[in-house]
A protein has these predicted regions:
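Short, low-complexity disordered leader/linker segments with a strong preference
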Residues: 1-36
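Early extracytoplasmic/lumenal segment of secretory-pathway proteins
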Residues: 27-99, 220, 354
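Periplasmic solute-binding protein
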Residues: 94-105, 124-152, 180-190, 269-273
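Short beta-strand->loop
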Residues: 106-115, 129-130, 158-161, 233, ...
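Ligand-binding pocket segment of bilobal, Venus flytrap-like solute-binding proteins
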Residues: 182-263
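Mature extracytoplasmic/periplasmic domains
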Residues: 272-331
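Extracellular/periplasmic bilobal clamshell ligand-binding domains
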Residues: 317-354
Length: 354
């Protein structure tokens, strides 16, 4: 081989090496990501052992980034669409789903874990989001308050407008509260586009109390909450609130001190999705699979007080005995909610608080 030929060969090898190096750098240095980031709301909770189980099984560090309530999380994700802060978003519910899908936040992924999930919970046929849990927002009432006065607790939304229930109800503002919005949607679903406004006029005339959020409504104003000095025996809360009252009271009561008006319940489903532009899409798929696993699903009830969607997951005894799963909850299509939510909240504000 001539000296010139050797120089050419050396140059070609060097060029090839440089091209390979550049290609490798463009692909993130050829190193697999070592963590997966979950973007979620402030109410997300899980046991330490469950988090450690995922990290042990996947070989990844699971970082949890909490960013406000569900609405704030979705808004922030939309602002960073395509260049997300995390790999998976958990907490978008059916009230926010159409907004998130229209914003092209997610990439499709059909998890094998969906084989254990009823079709009832799957609202996106393209599997851009995966159902993880469900809960119902319902009227709760203080059993002792009604028993002491010989008054039957309300059995329907209509009952709340009757004279005997005057000044007994506290609700959350739908402009500032997730359960407050769900209750407004329940009245839209029950009375229709032409009737819900009159229903709220009747509630206002009957002395409904409106507060900003669930914390004040339930723990301060509602008479049935443990330690509360409230004087309102009816509140908008959750179907899982009665078992929570049993669990957190000392000593534990034999029966739940609060009840649920089943005909008032509005269904909420929470979803998780892989964010478009995720830095660790492979890890994101593993995390979605884990969120559907029995290990995580059975941790949900006592951590976040909602229900698992995996039909094979076992409920804790407190949920089996005291929780309510209404057979026919009120619902609205996500697309209908997205198209009308702001207008409905504005109308509600004019009718109820102005």
């Amino acid at each position: 081989m001539t000296k010139c030929h050797k120089l050419v060969c050396t140059a070609l090898v060097a060029a090839a090496a440089l091209a390979l190096a550049l290609a490798t750098a463009a692909c993130g240095g050829g190193e697999k990501p070592t963590e997966v980031v979950l973007l979620t709301h402030d109410s997300f909770a899980l046991s330490d052992g469950v988090k450690q189980a995922f990290e042990r099984e996947s070989g990844l560090t699971w970082r949890i980034l909490q960013a406000g309530d569900a609405g704030e999380v979705v808004t922030k994700a939309l602002l960073t669409a395509g260049n997300p802060e995390g790999d998976v978003l958990f907490g978008v519910d059916n009230n926010l789903l159409a907004r998130a899908l229209e914003g092209d936040l997610f990439v499709p992924y059909e998890s094998p874990g969906l084989a254990s999930v009823d079709e009832t919970w799957v609202l996106d046929p393209e599997h851009r989001v995966t159902p993880i849990d469900h809960g119902e927002v319902c009227l709760n009432y203080d059993k002792a308050w009604f028993a002491e006065r010989g008054l039957a607790p309300p059995a329907s939304l209509d009952d709340l407008t009757k004279p005997e229930y005057r000044k007994l109800l506290v609700v959350e503002n739908p402009a500032t509260s997730t359960p407050g919005l769900a209750f407004l949607l329940a009245t839209v679903a029950r009375y229709g586009e032409g009737g819900w406004q009159d229903y709220w006029r009747r509630l206002r005339a009957n002395g409904v109390l409106v507060v900003d959020g669930w914390e004040e409504a339930y723990t301060v104003r509602f008479s049935g909450a443990a330690g509360s000095k409230g004087n309102r025996p009816i509140v908008v809360s959750y179907a899982s609130s009665p078992p929570a009252e049993v669990i957190f009271r000392t000593p534990r009561p034999e029966e739940a001190p609060t009840g649920v008006v089943e005909s008032s319940c509005f269904r909420q489903i929470e979803f998780a999705g892989i964010l478009r532009g995720a830095r660790n899409e492979e890890g994101a798929r593993k995390l979605i699979d884990f969120l559907l696993s029995r290990r995580f699903q059975e941790d949900i009830p006592l951590q976040m007080f909602v229900f698992p969607v995996n039909r094979e997951a076992k409920l804790p005894p407190e949920f089996e005995r005291f929780a309510v799963v209404p057979p026919d909850p009120l619902t609205l299509a996500p697309e209908e909610i997205e198209a009308n939510r702001e207008r409905w909240v504005d109308e509600w504000t004019r009718i109820v608080v102005r």
